[in-house]
UniProtKB/Swiss-Prot annotation:
Sequence intervals crossing the membrane: none
One Pfam assignment: HrcA
SUPFAM superfamilies (alphabetical): GAF domain-like, Winged helix' DNA-binding domain
GO term, biological process aspect, one: negative regulation of DNA-templated transcription
HAMAP family: HrcA
GO molecular function: DNA binding
Domain of life: Bacteria
Protein name: Heat-inducible transcription repressor HrcA
Keyword list, A-Z: Repressor, Stress response, Transcription, Transcription regulation
Species of origin: Bradyrhizobium sp. (strain BTAi1 / ATCC BAA-1182)
Role this protein plays: Negative regulator of class I heat shock genes (grpE-dnaK-dnaJ and groELS operons). Prevents heat-shock induction of these operons.
Lineage: Bacteria, Pseudomonadati, Pseudomonadota, Alphaproteobacteria, Hyphomicrobiales
Family: Belongs to the HrcA family.
Amino acid sequence: MAHHDPINLMTPPAGLAQLNERSREIFRQIVESYLATGEPVGSRNISRLIAVPLSPASVRNVMADLEQLGLIYAPHTSAGRLPTEAGLRFFVDALMQVGDMTEAERQSIQSQLASVGRAQSVEAALDEALTRLSGLTRAAAVVLTAKSNTRLKHIEFVRLEPERALVVLVGEDGQVENRVLALPPGVPSSALTEASNFLNARIRGRTLAEARLELETALAHDRAELDQLTQKVIAAGVASWSGGDSDDRQLIVRGHANLLEDLHALEDLERVRRLFDDLETKRGVVDLLGRAENADGVRIFIGSENKLFSLSGSSTIVSPYSDATGRIVGVLGVIGPTRLNYARVIPTVDYAARLVSRLLGG
């Protein structure tokens, strides 16, 4: 099941381990009330909710201790209390019972992905997974994936200058990618044509990663058949596919509208507007999701742990997924308010990532 180490938790408040059962129960009720309503909760309501009968005065004493520990705080407009980010992190890591998905929820994702199958592109499968994920979690669903997951259809070399050519890669999904290539001196047009023919005979239906492996083997075996300049063009072309910058990754977002539900104040609206901007421009979001690529299971970033200003009032729950070779090729998950239903969202993200891995043969 999901693995969620604390991510850069502000130093855990001293004395956390010493919280007795009564304090934990009161704290749990404060968090669960917040997750359900978004509103501060007072001692009178807590005393009605907890299993052990306690007077509001006794509850207030415990709440004062929890506040001292940095787990809850009093918003200036209310006599009630809300959990702090450190409190939410403590709840998620130490107190929360991770739920399980219903069979209907599992089927919802599974049947949608099965209908896509291998007949369509990886992007189509991810798109379906995200649509289901955002629907089930009522949050925005995101995926960070390598563009190289696209299966190739065709490659062409177009000469720009005597020593520069454009490599045009066309994917089966219609995606076109252009890269400029430096050519060795004296390359004739015939070498570009020969290189195109050699590559097209071997790359169709393969991802960039698969094509690279295939071509390294093919070049070793078929070197004698190829003109030396053609070999250099092919080697340079293959090298141009292996860039590791963020342009080689794409961010797909579905369910933006879910972020507009249940906003409590104007500042909430302003925060969501900034988040929309960041999701649109990818600023920082790619880096954030990239931090989860080497995780073993689900990673959770709460509030300011996100390191991205617009996400400071949000939570991000993500999990890596892998391809047929077991190599991690992307991250998927959800972005939503800090009062996400963590117990429900964590297994849903975990399940979606496993299904996508299975679809890719991982």
